[in-house]
Structure formats: C-alpha cells, structure tokens
C-alpha cells in the first residue's frame, strides 16, 4: 500500500493560497483537508499513488541534488516509512531544500511522510546513484500495487 502525507502549517501572517502553491510546486495530491491548531491551520495533503511524486522526481534532477537527496532520504528511512522536511519558502519558488530541524524553516517546514512496501525501490527511483553527478541508471516508477 502506498500512502503519502504532506503536512504544512499556515501561520496567521501567511496567505493560505501561497502555502498551498508551495506544496503544488513539488507534489500532486488526491485529497486536501484543513485542521485547526490554535491560531494556525494545518493543511494535510494525501495521496495513494507514487505518481504524486513525479514533480519532486523531476525537480531533484533539475536541481542536480540527487546524491544529497539520496543520503537524506536513506537517513530518514525507518521500516517502510520515509519522512523528511522541506523549507516552505524554497518550495514556494519551486526549489527543494531539505531541513533537519523545524527551526531551519522560519515559517515552519513542509513535512512529508511516504509509506511504501519497498522503500529502497522508491529511493532508487527518486534518487539513483550517480557518477560525477550523472545518474548511473533511471528506474521506472515503482508499482503502487
């Protein structure tokens, strides 16, 4: 089973549409819900297909950050779940910037959780090993089944 959850806080000073666009710049999703937490809203985008990661896949190549991203995803793999955080401001302009701590993204990070039956196959598709920055292979997108 494939499950992708993207969570992002919308602070009172932020435009919700711009925060939503930051998610859309890197990911597609099937469902979007809004949760309230005090004065803030949390947008939760969900998907059940790896096709939702195609923009992210393409951006990793455009930005030539495959090696760094591979290390980051592998480091954040526990069992069948990969979790990572992205800088919200970078995503707002269509860029990928991984963060290790929520404080690295002043308005809060975009939190991504991917549950997949074969996470190593997913990592190999998203971020293949490279030689001098060139992918050694390009695997097809893994099956959602």
From Swiss-Prot:
InterPro entries: PAB1135-like, Ribosomal_uL5_dom_sf. It comes from the Archaea. Disulfide bonds: none annotated. Belongs to the UPF0201 family. This is UPF0201 protein STK_09490. It comes from Sulfurisphaera tokodaii (strain DSM 16993 / JCM 10545 / NBRC 100140 / 7).
């Amino acid at each position: 089973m494939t499950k992708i959850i993207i969570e992002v806080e919308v602070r009172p000073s932020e435009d919700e549409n711009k925060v939503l666009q930051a998610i859309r710049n890197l990911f597609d999703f099937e469902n979007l819900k809004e949760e309230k937490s005090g004065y803030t809203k949390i947008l939760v985008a969900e998907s059940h297909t790896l096709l939702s990661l195609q923009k992210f896949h393409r951006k990793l190549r455009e930005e030539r950050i495959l090696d760094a991203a591979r290390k980051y995803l592998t480091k954040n793999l526990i069992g069948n779940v990969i979790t990572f955080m992205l800088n919200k401001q970078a995503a707002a302009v269509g860029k990928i910037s991984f963060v290790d701590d929520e404080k690295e993204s002043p308005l809060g990070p975009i939190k991504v959780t991917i549950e997949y039956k074969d996470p190593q196959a997913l990592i190999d598709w998203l971020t293949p090993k490279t030689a001098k920055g060139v992918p050694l292979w390009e695997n097809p997108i893994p099956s959602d089944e």
